[in-house]
Amino acid sequence: MAPNNGSWLVLSISMMLLSHGMIIIAKDQAIHHHDDDHDDMLINDHQMINDDDPYRTAYHFQSPKNWMNDPNGPMIYKGIYHLFYQYYPYDPVWHTEIVWGHSTSTDLINWTQQPIALSPSEPYDINGCWSGSITILPQNKPVILYTGINNKNYQVQNLALPKNLSDPYLKEWIKLPQNPLMAGTPTNNNNINASSFRDPSTAWQLSDGKWRVIVGTQQGKRGLAVLFTSDDFVKWNNTGNPLHSTEGNGIWECPDFFPVYVGKSLGADTSIIGDDVKHVLKLSLFDTQYEYYTIGRYDIEKDIYVPDEGSIESDLGLRYDYGKFYASKSFFDDETNRRILWGWVNESSIQADDIKKGWSGVQAIPRTVVLDKSGKQLVQWPLAEVDMLRENDVELPSQVIKGGSLVEISQITASQADVEISFKIPESNYVEELDSTCTNPQILCSQKGASIKGRFGPFGLLTLASMGLEEYTAVFFRIFKGPNKYVVLMCSDQTRSSLNPTTDKLSFGIFVDVDPINEDLSLRILIDHSIVESFSAKGKSCITARVYPTMAINDKAKLYVFNNGTEDVKITKLSAWSMKKAQINLSTDNTSNMSYNSNKVEKEEF
């Protein structure tokens, strides 16, 4: 528990007033305020998204329309799941004056739209309410720490509280009058660059009673997770030393720092410390738009994070996902003892196409995160709740797939599906040698795509395929022989995903830590119109792709097992399902424009 000093009393009193609905809102501070009716803060659906849009997802989280990016502050409160997200309600293109969208769910699959939680209104956030996190304080009190872009376009950190703690949906939030709580300087003389200082993490508390939080910044090209401490969650002190820093990769966005149990498939509360846990530091690299993580040790005496020996601290290191996946945020679900991960999946289309369809951005399916039994990497898997959308189960018997073969998986909706498949290869002396210079799996996948014959591989699945194979997104394995062991390459090849010449058609790849002789090679793929999420080796490696077929859409899409290698491979298991449509962000108001509300606490209330 934090000490009961004066500042903590301020926060405690404010929380008490909020819980009894006694806070006075400063209505005169609102901007773009059309009506005092709270429901007017809902997103205007007067111009609805086209229901026939072939790229609109059916069971992935999306905003009702327009622009969405980072997931913010996911949590569970009074049995209700909350997801906040970076949202621009007027345009499917990013703008700095962004707000916090908000949705709630009882199952993490079906979502109800809630009023905007935070919007620009005060000098400290007038140019945008950027990303942040939620921390659950003692007595189950959630608070938001977020980055505001102030009236000088500097980045500062602010606090917001729920207006009514008895409301499980937390529809209204109040900004603290002491904001901003953390700030840099234009001269960078406090080791914080005021123009690159953002995305506060979930806070954690140690036995000394102090709260700790990290914020991403940079010094030149050195990325830093600046560490702040507080006795009361209001007055924050820069410790002067970062939790961690690395030279050469620019600003660290959306830092996430959390413990993982060793030898347990359970999540851990963010403040857990002990001999049976390691720590994960995840960073999103603005310069490359990739993110990486390391696993290591948290030295609580020095308040520093030390990655395990051999860790690669760059975008060539370990990633949650080797495709389109950025600005991720995890939280601990204390009701199910899971750590759950959200991540933003950006478009691969040109801006003109985004404007035409009226929306941009998808959230990946939420995933559980645990430490692999090796202790060297994380394992991710779609939440078990996703399985409740499955229908029309199709099973294929164990069979050999000869080189050059193509087998259709029929009787499911191939544009909206979930498929699990496992392969087995025989031990052989006829395996391609891996060139010792081929150390980058993404480059290797681009050179050896699905159409390039090998020996063992490529074999896998052709998703979102047209009948004549003019279009398909291939997810496959290719086996090589390295100096001392077999090497398994997993690829997501989008080079033939669309006949539209303007879409980005990349190949993503990763070397999978699996023994192909003694273990099955498994894939699980979630297909949802314009997104293909692939999980291999039971979640050791993940690749997410955004694709926009012109022919393989809706009921015209096909799903195939293929083997374009010269050697036979065996399917040991194949199960596929159509996926039902989830209820996501159906509007509860269709009558009025969304308004921005300042949600500011009058100072004289304290």
From Swiss-Prot:
Sites carrying sugar chains: N5, N110, N164, N193, N237, N346, N564, N585, N590, N593
pH dependence: Optimum pH is 5.0.
Gene3D superfamilies: Exo-inulinase, domain 1, Glycosyl hydrolase domain, family 43
GO BP of this protein: carbohydrate metabolic process
Temperature-activity profile: Optimum temperature is 30 degrees Celsius.
Presence of the UniProt keyword DNA-binding in the record: no
Top-level EC class as recorded in UniProt: hydrolase
Signal peptide per UniProt: 1-21
Entry keyword annotation includes Ligase: no
InterPro entries reported in the protein's UniProt record: ConA-like_dom_sf, Fructan_Metab_Enzymes, Glyco_hydro_32, Glyco_hydro_32_C, Glyco_hydro_32_N, Glyco_hydro_beta-prop_sf
UniProt entry keywords in alphabetical sequence: Disulfide bond, Glycoprotein, Glycosidase, Hydrolase, Signal
Catalytic residues as annotated in Swiss-Prot or TrEMBL: D70
EC number: 3.2.1.154
A Pfam short name: Glyco_hydro_32N
Top-level taxon: Eukaryota
Reaction(s) catalysed (UniProt annotation): Hydrolysis of terminal, non-reducing (2->6)-linked beta-D-fructofuranose residues in fructans
SUPFAM superfamilies named among the record's database cross-references: Arabinanase/levansucrase/invertase, Concanavalin A-like lectins/glucanases
SMART domains (UniProt xref): Glyco_32 (SM00640)
Known regulation of activity: Not inhibited by sucrose.
GO molecular function terms noted in the UniProt entry: fructan beta-(2,6)-fructosidase activity
Disulfide bonds: C445-C491
Biological function: Hydrolyzes levan-type beta-(2->6)-linked fructans to fructose, but not inulin-type beta-(2->1)-linked fructans.
Family: Belongs to the glycosyl hydrolase 32 family.
Name of this chain's protein: Fructan 6-exohydrolase
Taxonomic lineage of the native organism: Eukaryota, Viridiplantae, Streptophyta, Embryophyta, Tracheophyta
